């Protein structure tokens, strides 16, 4: 169990001590997808959804979620994010929305969880706003795309 940084020798979960780490610029990108019926996607794309602009609401929800990750994930550090960006793209040929988030900071710990949380909550917001017209939407393929900075260096997911 000692390979997990959040688990001590006794098997207890603790927040990692990052006080001795170097401050570096760190960035992470994540993605999520929401699969839906063509009619649901058309409501979003055309802007005719009765609840308003689904993409704008999901974008703001994702940004807010990134800033609150430390409140949601028990062992995450509160971070002073310098950038949070959430992009949403309708992929009509596949009846889905792709969400990509980017989080950045200069700090002692990474922003992977913030990027993943932003993408996830944006996807959940799309579901919430559209569930009245379709309940069988599928949220999936949430993953880290890339991260830079820090001791572990650069990571890029396979395409």
From Swiss-Prot:
Per the UniProt entry, the Enzyme Commission number(s) are 4.6.1.17
Any single GO molecular-function term of the entry would be: GTP 3',8'-cyclase activity
Q: Is Lyase one of the keywords?
A: yes
Pathway it acts in?
Answer: Cofactor biosynthesis; molybdopterin biosynthesis
Give the CDD domains listed for this entry. Answer: MoaC_PE (cd01420)
Can the keyword Lyase be found in this entry's annotation? Answer: yes
Listed under GO biological process in this entry are: Mo-molybdopterin cofactor biosynthetic process
Q: Which InterPro entries match?
A: MoaC, MoaC_bact/euk, MoaC_sf, MoCo_biosynth_MoaA/MoaC, Mopterin_CF_biosynth-C_dom
Which residues constitute the catalytic centre? 128
Gene3D superfamilies per the UniProt record, alphabetical: Molybdopterin cofactor biosynthesis C (MoaC) domain
Q: What does this protein do?
A: Catalyzes the conversion of (8S)-3',8-cyclo-7,8-dihydroguanosine 5'-triphosphate to cyclic pyranopterin monophosphate (cPMP).
Which family does the entry's similarity section mention?
Answer: Belongs to the MoaC family.
Entry protein name: Cyclic pyranopterin monophosphate synthase
Source organism of this protein record:
Aliivibrio fischeri (strain ATCC 700601 / ES114) (Vibrio fischeri)
């Amino acid at each position: 169990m000692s390979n997990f940084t959040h688990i001590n020798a006794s098997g207890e979960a603790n927040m990692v001590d990052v006080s001795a780490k170097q401050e570096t610029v760190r960035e992470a990108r994540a993605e999520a997808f929401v699969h839906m019926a063509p009619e649901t996607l058309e409501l979003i794309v055309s802007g005719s959804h009765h609840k308003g602009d689904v993409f704008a609401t999901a974008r703001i929800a994702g940004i807010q979620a990134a800033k609150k990750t430390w409140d949601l994930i028990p062992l995450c550090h509160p971070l002073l994010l310098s950038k949070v960006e959430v992009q949403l793209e309708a992929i009509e040929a596949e009846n889905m929305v792709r969400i990509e988030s980017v989080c950045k900071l200069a700090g002692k710990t990474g922003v992977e969880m913030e990027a993943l949380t932003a993408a996830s909550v944006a996807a959940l917001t799309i579901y919430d706003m559209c569930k009245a017209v379709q309940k069988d939407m599928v949220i999936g393929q949430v993953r880290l795309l890339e991260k830079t900075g820090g001791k572990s260096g650069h990571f890029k997911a396979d395409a």
